[in-house]
């Protein structure tokens, strides 16, 4: 839960922009080209625009935002995107309420408060590795905090590797004219993760406190080969095959975690 600083009396609207970005990876091994294509088809169906819309709608509810508009699209041959425009204020029908009653905060800050997701399934052409990446951005303006949705998003997707960035930009001014560049306490994104998630993941931080930039990346601690095999069981493979596949998967996980090629 976000720990707020003592409540401030603000001059006008809270102009702080808080942005949380996720890169979530699912890694899989599919032995044949046909199996790899079936994995892509499976992921494409499991995380189509309808499912992603439901996940992001849940996120909006969790952080206490009001949905203004939803745009979604499935792509050919694969992938999907969803964008939800949100506001801190309740949605008001201009036709019923009259333009003069529409909150300036809603109109002014519509372009800054949004939730988006894009998916990227892909496969290695020879080595049997298949990956699924979901990029999620939650940007809010005002007192709404995207950090409230951290645990839900990690649990909602098949998260072998998670890379998260959180930053706070802008300022809000109190009634005495003093500027405040952040309105809650934080020294790590890990502060807002559940004990269950912390127990399952190895985590690494790079934070720039004076710039209000927080970066955490993590991967699952335990490696269970069966969890990474698509349409196959480890017990049906020879010892040599298991060792080869395990080495390929662990290398892929390390490279995605560190963001660079390690085998060259």
Swiss-Prot record:
Modified residues (Pyruvic acid (Ser)): 113
Pathway: Amine and polyamine biosynthesis; S-adenosylmethioninamine biosynthesis; S-adenosylmethioninamine from S-adenosyl-L-methionine: step 1/1
Keywords: Autocatalytic cleavage, Decarboxylase, Lyase, Polyamine biosynthesis, Pyruvate, S-adenosyl-L-methionine, Schiff base, Spermidine biosynthesis, Zymogen
Positions bearing the site annotation: Cleavage (non-hydrolytic): 112-113
Required cofactor names: pyruvate
Gene Ontology cellular-component terms listed: cytosol
Any one GO biological process: spermidine biosynthetic process
Details of cofactor binding: Binds 1 pyruvoyl group covalently per subunit.
InterPro entries: AdoMetDC_fam_prok (IPR003826), S-AdoMet_deCO2ase_bac (IPR009165), S-AdoMet_deCO2ase_core (IPR016067)
Entry EC number(s): 4.1.1.50
Catalytic activity field: S-adenosyl-L-methionine + H(+) = S-adenosyl 3-(methylsulfanyl)propylamine + CO2
Active site annotation, chain numbering: 113 (schiff-base intermediate with substrate), 118 (proton acceptor), 141 (proton donor)
Domain of life where this protein originates: Bacteria
Entry comment on modification after translation: Is synthesized initially as an inactive proenzyme. Formation of the active enzyme involves a self-maturation process in which the active site pyruvoyl group is generated from an internal serine residue via an autocatalytic post-translational modification. Two non-identical subunits are generated from the proenzyme in this reaction, and the pyruvate is formed at the N-terminus of the alpha chain, which is derived from the carboxyl end of the proenzyme.
Enzyme class per UniProt: lyase
UniProt GO molecular function: adenosylmethionine decarboxylase activity
Keyword S-adenosyl-L-methionine appears in the UniProt entry: yes
NCBIfam families: SAM_DCase_Eco (TIGR03331)
Assembly description: Heterooctamer of four alpha and four beta chains arranged as a tetramer of alpha/beta heterodimers.
Similarity comment: family membership: Belongs to the prokaryotic AdoMetDC family. Type 2 subfamily.
Described purpose of this protein according to its UniProt entry: Catalyzes the decarboxylation of S-adenosylmethionine to S-adenosylmethioninamine (dcAdoMet), the propylamine donor required for the synthesis of the polyamines spermine and spermidine from the diamine putrescine.
Protein name (record): S-adenosylmethionine decarboxylase proenzyme
Lineage, highest ranks first: Bacteria, Pseudomonadati, Pseudomonadota, Gammaproteobacteria, Lysobacterales
UniProt gene name: speD
């Amino acid at each position: 839960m976000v720990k707020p600083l003592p409540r401030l009396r603000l001059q006008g609207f809270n102009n702080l922009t808080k942005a949380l970005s996720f890169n979530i990876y699912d890694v899989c091994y599919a032995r044949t080209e046909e199996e790899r294509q079936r994995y892509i088809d499976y992921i494409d169906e499991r995380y189509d625009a309808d499912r992603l819309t439901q996940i992001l709608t849940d996120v909006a509810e969790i952080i206490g935002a009001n949905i203004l508009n939803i745009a979604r699209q499935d792509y050919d041959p694969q992938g999907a995107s969803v964008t939800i425009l949100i506001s801190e204020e309740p949605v008001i029908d201009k036709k019923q309420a009259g333009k003069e009653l529409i909150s300036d905060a809603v109109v002014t800050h519509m372009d800054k408060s949004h939730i988006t997701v894009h998916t990227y399934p892909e496969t290695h052409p020879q080595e049997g590795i298949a990956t699924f990446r979901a990029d999620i951005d939650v940007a809010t303006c005002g007192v709404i905090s995207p950090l409230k949705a951290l645990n839900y998003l990690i649990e909602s997707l098949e998260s072998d590797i998670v890379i998260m960035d959180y930053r706070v930009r802008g300022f809000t001014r109190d009634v005495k004219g003093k500027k405040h560049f952040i309105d809650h306490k934080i020294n790590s994104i890990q502060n807002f993760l559940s004990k269950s998630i912390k127990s399952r993941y190895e985590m690494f931080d790079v934070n720039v406190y004076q710039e209000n930039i927080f970066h955490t990346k993590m991967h699952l601690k335990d490696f269970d080969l069966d969890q990474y095999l698509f349409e196959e069981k480890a017990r049906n493979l020879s010892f040599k095959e298991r060792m080869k596949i395990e080495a390929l998967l662990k290398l892929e996980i390390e490279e995605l975690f560190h963001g660079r090629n390690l085998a060259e």
